[in-house]
Amino acid sequence: MDQKIKSNKIYKKKNQIKKMFDRLSVNYDMMNTLFTLGIDKIWRKKLVNKLFIYKPKKILDIATGTADLAIEIVKIKPKKIIGIDISKKMISVGNKKIKKLKYERIIELREGDCEKIPFENNSFDAVTVSFGVRNFENLNKCLIEILRVLKKGGILLILETSIPKSRIIFFCYDLYLKTIYPLLYNLFSKNKNAYKYLRNSSLVFPNGKKFNNILMKNGFINVNNKPLTFGATSLYFGKKP
């Protein structure tokens, strides 16, 4: 009975997140640019530059959203990029961008959940996630699934928000989240609950060494992270043995 209640709660929260991103899909790209002052593009380029070192041919982009990262990855000329996301409307926006750029042969978007990735074992050379890990309902289950679909020696690269270590930088970061962020958000969205969720999830996510430890406990090796923009974001790396 307890397990059934737990499963129902997980489904309910996941469904709420799905609906939230469906509602945000129309203005999502513009909101990202405004909220990060355009720095999100630099962060994605950092991930792609790291990815290029390993020259992966087949890549899975989880929580692909509107496909910003998948589109950036095209620059390193992989054979195939498959993006999955639980939000149909985010995927719809992404597909329009892909069609406009004529990337249909390289990028394929599908509706999919990281807790049950719809691919066989050892399918991908690399898996990427850009600002989606903190939305995973069952983080450990998703990481186990990622490890499963990676080929031996395949890599995982994750971009995620983190907490600046410097007190001064954290003060500025927290002030921004409490003042400027909600003002910008209210201009483009009437969903206050979405703002609260996105802000709070950024603050409570187990970043830095804590997240490194989670990756290692789930079977990844050579795990490390690199803070970006004074620690407001981190780039995580892990490898399948």
Describe these PLM feature segments:
Residues 1-18:
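N-terminal auxiliary segments of SAM/dcSAM-dependent transferases
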Residues 16, 159, 163-214, 218, ...:
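C-terminal alpha-helical "lid/dimerization" subdomain adjacent to the S-adenosyl-L-methionine
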Residues 28, 127-128:
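Hydrophobic beta-strand segment of the Class I
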Residues 37-57, 72:
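Conserved alpha-helix/loop element of class I SAM-dependent methyltransferases that forms part
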Residues 58-116:
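Class I SAM-dependent methyltransferase SAM/SAH-binding core
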Residues 115-126:
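A short acidic, Gly/Pro-enriched loop at the edge of an enzyme's catalytic core
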Residues 140-152:
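A short glycine-rich, Lys/Arg-flanked "PGG" loop and its adjoining helix->strand segment in the class I
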Residues 212, 218-241:
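Core SAM-dependent methyltransferase catalytic element
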